[in-house]
């Protein structure tokens, strides 16, 4: 029998999006707005960017170490995106949730699918851009990728966006502040109807995002 002072299990929020949808910026803003959330830091073989900090944004590791961890079953989920591998440490997540800590996990749709299989009680959220043209403008606006990489990211984004129906909620990032409000409502348990996957017009929007040609 559980005592009255038992610690409640933490909640896990899984957020996924195609590259360029604004996921990272939204997650950072959400963390500032919701102090009870903690960011689950993933491991990656990707090269560290100038503005990133090891242990804050990612744990940057070599291919050999990452593969060793994967083979040892230390990842709750892991996937390869654009030639780089990403993984979520199993112990890190399980210990945090058991202690009552609410976690936010920023991953791709492949990782989200694995998380839902392992922890079906998680809340999964997919972020969509308002249009394919806007997605391309955001990718080009970064100024960090070559033309070849941008074209590849747009192709991968089309496949990513085809998986939006798998998620509990869908947030369209047509306005940063509105998208942030929707994410906050979900985290607070207010269940905003506009972020539901049956949102009016969402099917048409998603179809256009997947099939539209890149802006020339």
Summary of predicted features, one role per range:
Residues 1-13, 35:
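Extreme N-terminal, non-catalytic leader segments
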Residues 23:
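Conserved lysine of the Walker
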Residues 2, 144-145, 159-216:
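NTP-dependent small-molecule kinase module
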Residues 42-103, 109-113:
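ATP-dependent small-molecule kinase phosphotransfer cores
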Residues 103-108, 117-141, 172-173:
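Conserved phosphate-donor/acceptor-positioning beta-strand/loop module used by diverse small-molecule
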Residues 16-18:
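P-loop (Walker A) phosphate-binding loop of NTP-binding proteins
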Residues 31-40:
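Post-Walker A helix-loop "phosphate-sensing" segment adjacent to the P-loop in P-loop NTPases
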Residues 26-27:
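Post-Walker A alpha-helix
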């Amino acid at each position: 029998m559980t005592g009255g002072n038992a610690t409640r299990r933490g909640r896990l929020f899984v957020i996924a999006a195609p590259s360029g949808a604004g996921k990272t910026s939204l997650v950072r803003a959400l963390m500032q707005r919701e102090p009870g959330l903690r960011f689950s830091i993933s491991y990656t073989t990707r090269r560290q960017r100038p503005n990133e900090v090891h242990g804050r944004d990612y744990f940057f590791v070599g291919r050999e170490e990452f593969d060793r961890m994967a083979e040892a079953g230390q990842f709750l989920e892991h996937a390869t995106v654009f030639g780089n591998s990403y993984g979520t440490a199993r112990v890190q997540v399980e210990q945090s949730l058991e202690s009552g800590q609410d976690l936010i996990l920023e991953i791709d749709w492949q990782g989200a699918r694995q998380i839902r299989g392992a922890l079906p009680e998680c809340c999964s959220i997919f972020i969509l851009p308002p249009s394919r043209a806007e997605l391309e403008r955001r990718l080009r606006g970064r100024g960090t990728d070559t033309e070849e990489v941008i074209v590849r990211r747009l192709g991968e984004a089309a496949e990513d966006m085809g998986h939006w129906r798998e998620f509990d909620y869908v947030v369209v990032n047509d306005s940063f502040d509105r998208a942030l409000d929707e994410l906050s409502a979900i985290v607070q348990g207010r269940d905003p109807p506009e972020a539901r996957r049956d949102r009016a017009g969402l099917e048409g929007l998603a179809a256009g995002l997947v099939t539209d040609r890149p802006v020339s």
